[in-house]
Amino acid sequence: MKRYATLSLLLGAAWLGAADAADPAGSGAEPAIVYSDAALPTHTIYRPARLMDRYPVVLWGNGSCVNSNFGYREFLAEVASHGFIVLAIGPHRDSPAPREQRPADPADWPPFETHYSQMQDALEWIAAENGRQGSPFLGKVAVEKVAVMGHSCGGLQAVRASVDPRVTTTVVLNSGMMADDDQYMRRHELERSILGEMHAPIAYFIGGESDIAYPNAENDWQALQQLDLAAINANLDVGHGATYQMPNGGPFARGPLAWLQWQLQDDAQARAMFVGAACGLCAGSDWTLRRHFPQ
């Protein structure tokens, strides 16, 4: 818990960026645009500039549960450019506000800036837009293909939102649960038993042993072995902050993007990143991959 508290103090300062920084477009075949809609002012939309197909939805939660996705814009635009509609908590182009020193005990912290229910709010909005005459999303949303995904504190938001029956897969980045009596867990309205309530495949992408969330993710992995649920745990030695701010999300983006492409787009090449003895994240890569695929 103390490790996550330390992270919360650091991220706001680390992700302050130039207000005039150009929005990235990603490297995929469908360059992304980034904006907010007046009807969903609490979120930023990352999506292909030209909506030529039906696109899966990715719901995003930020590290420290801050109300800003500014530090993830390279990564999220990269995801969108490969054919996804990403709805990220936080208004467009807002940088995290500087923070004062928090008390050591999370019981004394002010409330989180954001809540897992904002993922559900975004899903309700995009589903309505899919059927609204005059909407750019009319008939363009694959509402049956939905991922919840987040970094660190946002990863816990994704776990909490994952029991929604509309969720197709959960992606946990540099995160993992604590003990039930941990104040951090209570603030997320989380208990470890939620793993047993999950109904869809789950993927953990962690930054190696130097990642402050590594022990938490390991505990979750052990629990997942007992469940009839497809799951992976993939580590790349990049630490807790990973490479989200690098162009197109850097090398860490490769794993989560492939998982989304497999789970939500039925992409055979993406599947090969995780399945088989010679899989893309297996031996010979910089990743360490563990898999639990019940028959």
Residues of each region from the PLM?
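Bacterial N-terminal signal peptides that target proteins for export
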Residues: 1-6
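Bacterial N-terminal signal peptides
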Residues: 8-14
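A domain-start/cap signature at the N-terminus of enzymes
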Residues: 19-47, 279-282, 290-295
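Serine-hydrolase catalytic machinery in alpha/beta-hydrolase-like enzymes
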Residues: 36-141
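Glycine-rich His-Gly loop
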Residues: 60-64, 152, 175, 207
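Primarily recognizes the serine-hydrolase "nucleophile elbow" in alpha/beta-hydrolase
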Residues: 124-197
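The feature captures the conserved acid-bearing segment of alpha/beta-hydrolase catalytic domains
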Residues: 168-246
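Alpha/beta-hydrolase-fold serine-hydrolase catalytic core, especially in secreted/extracellular enzymes
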Residues: 237-241, 246-295
